[in-house]
Swiss-Prot record:
Domain of life: Eukaryota
Residues in BPTI/Kunitz inhibitor domain copies: 30-80
Protein name from the UniProt record: Kunitz-type serine protease inhibitor PILP-1
An example Gene Ontology molecular-function term: serine-type endopeptidase inhibitor activity
Length: 82
């Protein structure tokens, strides 16, 4: 295979990788209900609500949780809103 063909193949693979949508495996914390169990502390956090297609605020109790909480609405939207 010539170097030009290899370069074209590399370019196409790079383009494919950039344009492929992110799967739900990469966003596990976006698809779960928020953990509202009370533990060591109560702080405001945000979770993604797929029905509302928005990040909503809730009281996070500080437990180990399920990974579905974000410190800010901006971070939540960045990771989950598609």
């Amino acid at each position: 295979m010539s170097s030009g063909s290899l370069l074209l193949l590399l370019g196409l693979l790079t383009l494919w990788a950039e344009l492929t949508p992110i799967s739900t495996k990469d966003r596990p914390s976006c698809d779960k209900a928020p953990d509202t169990e009370r533990c060591k502390r109560n702080v405001y956090a945000f979770y993604y609500n797929p029905s509302a297609r928005d990040c909503l605020q809730f009281v996070y109790g500080g437990c180990d949780g399920n990974g579905k909480h974000f410190r800010s609405k901006a971070l939540c939207l960045f990771h989950c809103h598609r």
